[in-house]
A protein has these predicted regions:
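Ribonuclease/tRNase effector modules and their secretory precursors
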Residues: 1-101
Length: 101
């Protein structure tokens, strides 16, 4: 599936990556549509400290996962795609590219 992110860039979520996400993080299976929402309406976007071509999109949901943020990890490039998605306890270090005020 092809989506647009907050920056109007095209992001792909392949079937292979979706299968990886639900295998490693089965609690996310009912929340595929939230991945799209995180990309479009993030609370934070950070650049990874490990890979400058990786962006970290965070969104807090009060109604699921005890308010912990959902993190969608995207590899940017000629073909940008979702690497993974999971629930996290912390906002990782890195340059903040955007923050909801």
């Amino acid at each position: 599936m092809i989506y647009k992110d907050f920056f109007e860039d095209t992001i792909e979520l392949t079937d292979e990556r979706w299968q990886h996400i639900i295998k490693e993080h089965p609690e996310l299976k009912p929340y595929k549509e939230r991945i799209i929402e995180v990309l479009l309406k993030p609370d934070y976007v950070k650049r990874s400290t490990r890979d400058s071509e990786v962006l970290l999109y965070y969104k807090f949901y009060g109604d699921i996962f005890l308010g912990k943020p959902m993190l969608v990890v995207v590899k940017k490039g000629l073909r940008s795609f979702v690497l993974t998605c999971y629930i996290t306890d912390v906002i990782k270090k890195g340059v903040t590219l955007w923050e909801r005020k």
